[in-house]
Amino acid sequence: MQVYQCCEAIRIAYNQIGSGEQGYVPQAIAATIRALNAVASDERVPADLREQAAYAAANLLISDHEDA
């Protein structure tokens, strides 16, 4: 997925990080899993979205990608 395919909020954050306005998170995979976990565990979030977040987090945990 490319940044131009993402929602406006992601594109804004991407531009802020790229410009130095916001700090880069060096352990991005761990940060992503924490964010997905927060969504997956929040009962205020619709069940289908929580399931998507849980599936995405599980795939990251199983994948061979690691934070540098």
Swiss-Prot record:
Q: Which domain of life is it from?
A: Bacteria
Pfam family, any one: UPF0253
Membrane-spanning segments: none
Entry similarity comment: Belongs to the UPF0253 family.
Name the UniProt record assigns to this protein: UPF0253 protein AHA_2115
**Chain coiled-coil ranges:** none
Q: Per the UniProt entry, what species is this protein from, by scientific name?
A: Aeromonas hydrophila subsp. hydrophila (strain ATCC 7966 / DSM 30187 / BCRC 13018 / CCUG 14551 / JCM 1027 / KCTC 2358 / NCIMB 9240 / NCTC 8049)
